[in-house]
């Protein structure tokens, strides 16, 4: 084949440190817009960014020229600086270590988009921990429940 054709859809999820509710609904769009800009600068295409006060979901078209851990590190580091430098939170903002990432086929993009778009409604009845366990189980990812949000000793 004379050219390279790639379409990889990824769904990233990561939490505020200690799952604190630091992303106010008032600042949410500003923070998500900054994240989208960062993704574009890194040559990825954000499709939707959503979440609630204690975590974020990102659906993107991923450019494999950048390693996933590097993408997440740059996104978290840049967003943390943006939030703290612009005093978008009352307290010092930090992301929790780690993240979850799931891949989806093109046929599932609309469903994942709607899922992320409806995070506020979705979390009226489900915690982030419940949501993440459900996603991990759905993808057959093995995990130790006690370490989902805490560091192994």
Whereabouts are the PLM-identified features?
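Basic nucleic-acid-binding interfaces
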Residues: 1-153
């Amino acid at each position: 084949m004379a050219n390279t054709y790639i379409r990889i859809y990824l769904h990233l999820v990561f939490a505020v440190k200690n799952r604190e509710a630091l992303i106010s609904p008032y600042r949410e769009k500003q923070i998500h817009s900054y994240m989208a800009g960062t993704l574009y600068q890194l040559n990825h295409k954000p499709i939707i960014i959503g979440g609630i006060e204690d975590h974020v979901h990102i659906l993107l078209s991923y450019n494999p020229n950048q390693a996933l851990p590097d993408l997440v590190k740059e996104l978290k580091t840049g967003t943390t600086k943006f939030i703290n430098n612009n005093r978008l939170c009352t307290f010092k903002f930090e992301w929790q270590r780690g993240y979850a990432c799931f891949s989806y086929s093109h046929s599932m993009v609309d469903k994942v988009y709607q899922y992320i778009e409806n995070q506020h409604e979705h979390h009226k009845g489900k915690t982030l921990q419940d949501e993440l366990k459900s996603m991990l189980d759905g993808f057959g990812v093995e995990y130790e429940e006690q370490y989902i949000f805490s560091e192994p000793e």
